[in-house]
Amino acid sequence: MGFTDETVRFNLDDSNKKEISETLTDVYTSLNEKGYNPINQIVGYVLSGDPAYVPRYNNARNQIRKYERDEIVEELVRYYLKGQGIDL
């Protein structure tokens, strides 16, 4: 499979956006309750894909694995840009 010079469109449907946001909140809470640095652990998972960054506590690992990492990144970027006042 080769690369192309054409721009590829990536779209995440609206129903997943809210679910991803809720899942990230739940996972953050679970990580915090277990004494981990939630931001570091979530970043580790998103960058590596290794589910060991997220504990099984409160089913956090299974929750975050329901979504592709690119979907999580898209939601994080969207949330950040909205927070910067960019109309999406």
Curated annotation (Swiss-Prot):
It comes from the Bacteria. InterPro entries: IreB. Disulfide bonds: none annotated. HAMAP family: UPF0297. Belongs to the UPF0297 family. This is UPF0297 protein SGO_2042. The lineage of its organism: Bacteria, Bacillati, Bacillota, Bacilli, Lactobacillales.
